[in-house]
Amino acid sequence: MSKPRSGEVLQAAPGGQDAAAPTLSLSGKVALITGASSGIGRAIALAYAAAGADVALGYRSNRRGAEETAEQARAAGRRADPLQADIAESRDVDALADAVRRAFGRVDVWINNAGADILTGAAASLSWTEKLDRLLAVDLRGTVLASWKAVELMRAQPSGGVILNMSWDHVLAGGMKGEYAQVFCAAKGGVYSFSRALAHAAAPHIRVNVLGPGWIETAYGSALPESVKQRITKSIPLGRWGTPEDIAHAAVYLASDAARYVTGQMLAVNGGSVV
């Protein structure tokens, strides 16, 4: 194809696709979000409900939080069902998939957001070996198991689907100094590489992408000393921490028709802190 001249507008997309701007609507879709009791998972669930999707809300132990997310999603006029599962356990993943299929009939978007907390509460006192075990069990193994199950479900439905996995923007840059970065890069780097491989295997009817959050205002960020938070803020080109809603907006895009030609990619949502 020749390069368009100044002022020239291309009238058709390759392959005969309609060149009109695609929509960010998720109307009529069914989405499963794990780790939906709070934080990023809750923000994604509410953004999906606002975009027109019905949502299944996966949680491990915080049922109250999942119910609160469900109430807010229902206020947007959408169906929202909390479903308990520990994605580190293969039997729970199978049961979760069966529950979604029975309740909603299908799943169009499966978001593996659940992750192990190794930085706050009692988990903060664990050894780095114990923290690594937790991260690998939940963040990596759980994501792999759940993604395989999602592919199984989506291949059985004519519409295919979308899988979104949660990584970390710093895996693109080798992380930072210290054990913190090493254990997170081990788990989240695995999620990134696995997702790229799965995108090839699941194509052409299933898209697989990765979200790479940077410094986001979650429970961990709130627990940091103010001096540390300010130092981090100064290092971010856009001059602020991200919010769970920033991640949610990216998740809506990746699940929508606007991203219909995007697969096997990581979308880093980080204010430019890793480029």
Predicted regions and their residues:
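The beta1-alpha1 cofactor-binding region of Rossmann-like NAD(H)/NADP(H)-dependent oxidoreductases
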Residues: 63-64, 84-95, 129, 245-246
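Conserved mid-core segment of classical short-chain dehydrogenase/reductases
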Residues: 94, 117-133, 175-183, 221-226
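Conserved glycine-rich cofactor-binding loop
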Residues: 30, 37-38
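C-terminal helical subdomain
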Residues: 3-17, 192, 210, 226, ...
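Amphipathic alpha-helical dimer-interface segment in Rossmann-like NAD(P)H-dependent oxidoreductases
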Residues: 98, 138-158, 171, 199-204, ...
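Catalytic loop of short-chain dehydrogenase/reductase
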Residues: 116-117, 155, 164-190, 195-203, ...
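Short, small/polar-rich loop/turn modules that mediate ligand/substrate recognition or access, typified
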Residues: 203-207, 262-264
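Catalytic Tyr-X3-Lys loop
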Residues: 127-145, 164, 184-191, 233, ...
